[in-house]
Amino acid sequence: MTKENLENELKTLPNSTGVYQYFNQEGKLLYVGKAKNLKNRVRSYFAFTPNLHANPRNSLRIQKMIEETVHLEFIATNSEADALILENSFIKQLHPKYNILLRDDKTYPYIYVDFEEEFPRFEITRKLVKKSKIKYFGPFFKGARELLDALYLYYPLKQKASCKSPCIFYQISRCLAPCDKLISREKYLEILDEAIHALLNPSVLLKNLEKQMLVLAQNENYEEAAKVRDQIAMIKDLEVKVEIDIAKLEDFEVFALAFKNSVLSTLRFVVQNGKIISANSKITPIKNDIQWDQNEIYKQLILENFSMDIPLLANVIYVYEEFEDRVLLEEILSQRFDKKISIKIPKIGEKRRICDLAFQNALLNIEKEQKNHDFTIQKELKSYFELENLPNDIEIFDNSHLQGVANVGAMVTYRINSWDKSKYRKFHLKHKNDYDQMREVLTRRALDFDKIPPPDLWLIDGGKALLDLAKEIIVSSGVNVDILAISKEKIDAKAHRAKGGAKDKIHSLKGEFSLSINDKKLQFLQKLRDEAHRFAISFHQNTKKKQDLKSSKLANLGLSSGVMQKLLAYYGNFESIYKADFKDLTMLVGRKAAQKIKEN
């Protein structure tokens, strides 16, 4: 592909809305953007005389991107709103080099009350509840379950979904047994209203709990008093302390961004009934300063926080500053939630002060992050191995088996200087050789890029062959992920693993590297590899134990070791053998053996 091809592609652009994609010489996706008019927007990136080159009027970030571009593709859409949604989806799934990806695939819990019930109770959800009389509170970015427990600790409301007679909560004075009509609905709803008021005003809940703790202590019920004390400490930790009075009892959201020293900080306040009930902050290291794009980040931040399957309680979203696609986002959210949603930039008054406060806190979070975390090693890796991404989000892969038995793979995740164990994954594998096993693991991970965004770096436990395999999978996925592999030095074509003499080599797409055993970069990569190895070995051992147990069960049925090996070779694991169709088993090992398996 050449610049001449690119010039011809520019001539084919239509005068319609859509999404465009830029690719480099290797076919890697560089950037995804949306346009009201594809022809005008894309051509604005270029100057055409004396020959095709980057338009010098654009930012350094855009000029650098265009210098790398040799190919473009586009998708026409029916509207600019459709284009924006598609653009956001591509960024999340494909992780283009010059787009910023906000890594937050979490959904946060809401507390809700279903007023269709005769005696409503507090419940937790992460999605819309399809009922007509639902009242939501939140989202709560931390401590939703603990907050709910505190409410139930003080207010004697129904806790069980269904109860036909007084339960343990009634016996310990934590419920008034509405199931047995020991309280009227009117009186019950009065208590519920008090609890809702406390939910929206944590200071009220704190005062009530402090009174309860004092009474319990005076009655020498120290164990229960200690529980209440712990609840008080938790709520104080959750409470958002903002000394700004909001005159109206209204609901709205606030978003602010801050950028400093190659770190992006985002902050969200949730205001309900005139009170800031929760706040969420996120830190995202940016590859370099020229990739800061305020409009792109606001779009991504707001669309990801208000997806179609979660509640949007407020009708107004306030942002710290203006951004290009604000009005378009209003249109998308209004259509998505079937009500008028406004995104505003307040100029004066309490809303302006809250937006300023959000921005100041976003800046403070950057300073706090930089004091707590040292990104030196990531910067050294990026520079030394000529990586495209700053490797803050790393996935490390390893496989484990014993002579083709209990074949498993493992992935561990290292994110912003700590292990993210919630993202660890285990794989049961069909193949028996290392190459095909790694292909299976990496392919399965790549197929999930639409659900769990790709990392900055893949680290493979293996040599150049597995590095090339990983490259093949990444290229076919169209995502922007760097790749490194780490392997033992080979002597006489065998990996040298003698204790004290095992030397590691690092493989990258730029070549092979032998680093000193005292090199911090090597030690860091070894630490990552060792954790993946530990996790894979542990999973292998547990799998082997289970397979040995199941193997003994098959042996007890009178099946020979030859039959069992044949079954395992075909089905891969014992679970699949037991689930296999009788007809397939019969064809493989005969009717008699098949009957024994299915009958037991």
Swiss-Prot record:
Keywords, alphabetical: Cytoplasm, DNA damage, DNA excision, DNA repair, Excision nuclease, SOS response
Gene Ontology biological process: nucleotide-excision repair; SOS response
Residue stretches making up the UVR domain: 203-238
Domain GIY-YIG, first and last residues per copy: 15-100
Stored SUPFAM superfamilies: C-terminal UvrC-binding domain of UvrB, GIY-YIG endonuclease, RuvA domain 2-like
One GO term describing the cellular component: excinuclease repair complex
A Pfam family matched in the record: UvrC_RNaseH_dom
Function: The UvrABC repair system catalyzes the recognition and processing of DNA lesions. UvrC both incises the 5' and 3' sides of the lesion. The N-terminal half is responsible for the 3' incision and the C-terminal half is responsible for the 5' incision.
SUBUNIT field: Interacts with UvrB in an incision complex.
Name used for this protein in its record: UvrABC system protein C
Organism, as annotated: Campylobacter jejuni subsp. jejuni serotype O:2 (strain ATCC 700819 / NCTC 11168)
Gene behind this protein: uvrC
